[in-house]
């Protein structure tokens, strides 16, 4: 009986010390900015100051105009690029990424080969090696 009480007492003391040392100490309250600057680990003067500026109506309108100019120039550039019509291939072959399900002819590109998926239900000519 005395041994169990001794073990329980030491366990209680251990738990008291453990709970006391596991909690962090209360932080000191800083009274002014000077003590804050001296105690801080990061120097606040190292970072550049940030200024927030509100846009007025004129600057908003100019930015809209610039955006419209960019959009119109992109549209003009896309209109200038006219898609060239593909010339029909004279040889009996299958173009790259077209269906080549057997008994279709071979692929036109010498680096391409007919690759089938889903139990040979979907076949297409694909270029497998880039170094060809």
Swiss-Prot record:
Main location as per UniProt: secreted
InterPro entries: Agouti (IPR007733), Agouti_dom (IPR027300), Agouti_dom_sf (IPR036836)
Keywords for the protein's UniProt record, in alphabetical order: Disulfide bond, Glycoprotein, Knottin, Secreted, Signal
Places the protein is found: Secreted
Record's keyword annotation contains Glycoprotein: yes
One Gene Ontology MF term: melanocortin receptor binding
Pfam families: Agouti
Residues bearing carbohydrate: 39
Keyword Hydrolase: no
Any GO CC annotation of this UniProt entry: extracellular space
Biased composition (Basic and acidic residues): 63-79
Cystine pairings recorded for this chain: 93-108, 100-114, 107-125, 111-132, 116-123
GO biological process: one example: melanin biosynthetic process
Signal peptide: 1-22
Region (Disordered): 57-88
Domain Agouti stretches: 93-132
Described purpose of this protein according to its UniProt entry: Involved in the regulation of melanogenesis. The binding of ASP to MC1R precludes alpha-MSH initiated signaling and thus blocks production of cAMP, leading to a down-regulation of eumelanogenesis (brown/black pigment) and thus increasing synthesis of pheomelanin (yellow/red pigment).
PANTHER family: AGOUTI RELATED, AGOUTI-SIGNALING PROTEIN
Domain notes: The presence of a 'disulfide through disulfide knot' structurally defines this protein as a knottin.
Protein name, entry field: Agouti-signaling protein
Gene: ASIP
